[in-house]
Amino acid sequence: QARRDAEALGVSPALAESLLQSLIRGSLTTQEQARVASQGRGSGRSALVIGGRGKMGHWMADFLAAQGFAVTVADPSGEVAADDYVADWKSSDLHHDIIVVATPIRIANAVLAELAGRRPRGIVFDIGSLKTPLRSGLEQLRAAGCHVTSVHPMFGPDTELLSGRHVIFIDLGDAAALAEARALFGSTMADLVVMGLDEHDRLIAFVLGLSHALNIAFFTALAESGEAAPRLARMSSTTFDAQLDVATRVATENPDLYFEIQSLNDYGVESLNALQAAVNRLCRSVQEGDAATFVAMMQQGNEYLRERQAARDEASR
C-alpha cells in the first residue's frame, strides 16, 4: 500500500518502503527494549561477564544490565563504563547468579575448565560461535556439579532489534540452567532454538562456515583479478552489487574470529569440501560444454531454496 501511495504522489516507491520499514523497526526496537527492562529479571541479582570488553561480551553486559543485573566485567583490556570491573576474573569470588564466558573461542575452553575447579553456584554459559572446541570444559563443569549450558546468539554486536534473529541454546542435560538462560531472552522477539552440541556445530559449518568461505573466495578472486580490478569498480549489476554488499560486510569482520570458525569446528571440513566439490562441478560443466549439468545445478538450487523458504514461512505462522 505504501508503494502505491508513494507512486501516486510522485515519490519513489522504494524510498517510501525503506522509510516505512525503518519507522517500523525503530518502533519495534523501542518496544522490545522497554519490555526487557520492565520485566526486571535481574533485579537484586548479579552477573559476571568474562571477556566483557569484546564486542559480543559488551553486548551481553549491556543486555544483562538492561534487565537489572548488577554486572561485573572481567577483562584484562581495561575498564568498561557503567559496569563494575576486575582485570582478572580469577580474583573474583564468583558469587554471581549468572557467569557468562565471552572470551575468544581459542581460550574459552580453558576458562570453562578453570571455572569448574572453582565450582561457582550460579548459572554458567558461554556465547561462542562454536561448541565442539568447548566440549571438555563444559563437561568438566557438569562433572563438578555446576549449573551449565551454552548459548549462541546468532547476530552481531550492533544488533538492537532481536525480532527475526535466532538464539541457540545447547542442552547439556541441566534443565534448570537451560531454562534460566532461555528466560534471559524470553522478553525479546528472538526465535529461541534448543539443540545438541554436535548438531549445532554440524549446522554452523554450513550456516557460518560455508557462507564465510564463499564470500572470502569471492572477494579474493576480485582482489586478485589484476588489471580488471579498477574497471570492476566502475561496473555493476543487480546480482554483483547484492553479492558485493554481503562480501564487503564479511571483509570488515574480525579475521581471527573467522579463522577460528573455520578451523576449530570438528565438522568444519564438511562444508568446505562441499563448496570445493560444487565449484569443481561447475567449472567442469562450463569447460566441457555440459549444459545439462549446469542447468541441473541451477534447478536443484532453485528447488532447494523454494522449499527452504516455504519451511521458514510455515515456521513463522
Where are the regions that the model predicts?
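NAD(P)-binding Rossmann-fold cofactor-contacting core
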Residues: W59, A66-D83
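Hydrophobic/small residue at the entry helix of a nucleotide-binding pocket
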Residues: M56
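Interdomain hinge/lid region at the active-site interface
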Residues: R231-L305
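N-terminal hydrophobic or amphipathic helices and topogenic motifs
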Residues: Q1-S46, Q67-A70, S77
